[in-house]
Amino acid sequence: MSEQSTLAGPYTEKPGVESQNPTGDGKASFDETSPRDIHGWRWAIAYAAMLSTTFLFALDNTIVANIQPSIINDFGHLELISWIGTGFALGTMFILLWGKIYGVFNIKWVYIFNILLFEVGSAVCGAAPNIQALIIGRVIAGIGGSGMYSGTLTYVSVLSNQKEKPAYLAGSTVVWGVGSVVGPVVGGAFAASSATWRWGFYINLPIGAVFAPAYMILFPNWDPNPTLTLAEKFRLVDWINAVIFLAGSACLTVALTFGGVVYSFNSGTIIALWTVTGVLLVAFIVLLKLHPLVSKENRLYPLHFFKQMTLINMQLQVFLASGIILAMTYYVPLYFQFIKGDGALQAGVRLLPLIMFMVAFSMVNGFLMPKYGLIPIWYIVGSALTLIGSALMYTIDENTSNGNVYGYNILVGAGAGCYIVAGFAIVQSLVPTHEIANAVGAMTISQDLGMVLFLAICGSLFHNVAVDKVGKALPSASETEIGNLIAGTSSSAFQALSEADKDLVIPEIASAMKSIWAFFMAAAALSFVCSWPLFKTKLGGKKVEASVVV
């Protein structure tokens, strides 16, 4: 099979629709012919159904930010609290595999399978009898959610021409932003109500049910390889390296999450996890080069991408920006709960400045960058604002006004919004048409890795530093008691403290959070430094004629 037919996958154009970038020279050509057969109200409903999955995916990314203390109150196991968020993010590591699968199998049925998987995971979370079952449900939902997200990108790519695509993807940006904004608020509202935190997961079921007829009836059948048998299609997927990649991601996440929390950093378990991670990484790279069962064009990640420094830079930038934003959605509400005494619902509302400005500036970038270019400026200004905002967050304590915290959050949100999604457009100008699927897949996996690793690192940082500082403030408390205290203000351990002890604990928790803001500063500084080489990047002219995705 030719490279075009196997790699183009979901990005293969219909006859009469011109290639976006056949040479990879950074210049795009356009044909206003619509590549889809569905129009009018049928297309409007189908597109709305796609946006519903984007909304649910975004909602689930942030909804647990405010309900974790309630979950710990019910189940205990504080040492596993970070896995409520990390488990979902770890499940999204499947997005690299889903991108390949969408390029081989019928898009509609892969998409519907992922919707079902997401709903099953949500049901498992809502009905979970213990925290272990909840984490398993979160992983399942993450796997399905990443498949839905990849499916939306795929459908928009094959069902819209280059003139339409920015508008349709801008709609996805808005819906994703709305889902991210309301996630902590909805989660906090459920946690504070008689419905309990379980409805933070059950809510996905009725929304999915409403759009189910559209999924089944209106989603177009699109098979990128209609002449191949099922067995031939399976042979086009790099299953071995997919398993190695997922196993390595899991080992790395466990090592980062449990190190210093469940096991000491120098314990045999943590050392073994790091060793296995390293071995799997080497095996992954070797198989990218020398895989005996899969052709070069069908391997999980194109090895020659490592030689394209701008593409690697784009992956690093989305890794850093996405990690900062998602981790902020977890720790800004925690700050307001501990330091300002907010309830779960009110703390969730405090995220609005961060998320709204991030979404607004993402949309501004999506509409202006394709017209005016200035790619390095977006990255330099954006990373600088993120760095300044993170540095100012490092200065906050229990006496900082809410207005100041909002202002610092706005800087971080606006800064990240300037470039968090820009790379998705840029990479499509760096590669030939038949490799756009691979380039977008590389960006999405970098985005998800950033979210997974930042949550894991921040969870470990906060737990270790807070236990040490609070332990000094309350020398008579055991490490287990201290761990329960820092789970959140709604935890029974924190509520049981006297007002005098709370006055001792709260400043120490604010101080412990400085480790997280410092980590964000380092990440933003790296992003800023790596933005300057973009001035030397040739993208085929001042304009980037490509779509932007979230």
Curated annotation (Swiss-Prot):
User: Which compartments is it annotated to reside in?
Assistant: Cell membrane
InterPro entries with a match to the protein in the record: MFS (IPR011701), MFS_dom (IPR020846), MFS_trans_sf (IPR036259)
Task: Spell out the residue ranges making up region: Disordered.
Answer: 1-33
Q: How does it sit in the membrane?
A: Multi-pass membrane protein
Q: Which PROSITE patterns match?
A: MFS
Mainly resides where? membrane
Is-annotated flag, keyword Transport? Answer: yes
Q: One GO molecular function term? A: transmembrane transporter activity
Domain of life, per lineage: Eukaryota
Residues bearing glycans: N399
Q: What induces it?
A: Expression correlates with the production of depudecin with high levels on oat grain medium, and minimal levels on oat flower medium and complete medium.
Spell out where the chain crosses the membrane.
44-64, 78-98, 109-129, 139-159, 172-192, 199-219, 242-262, 268-288, 319-339, 351-371, 373-393, 410-430, 439-459, 515-535
Q: Say what the protein does.
A: Efflux pump; part of the gene cluster that mediates the biosynthesis of depudecin, a highly oxidized eleven-carbon linear polyketide that acts as a histone deacetylase (HDAC) inhibitor and makes a small contribution to pathogenesis. Is presumed either to be responsible for exporting depudecin, to provide self-protection, or both.
Q: Which family does it belong to?
A: Belongs to the major facilitator superfamily. TCR/Tet family.
Q: Provide the protein name.
A: Efflux pump DEP3
Provide the organism lineage as a comma list: Eukaryota, Fungi, Dikarya, Ascomycota, Pezizomycotina
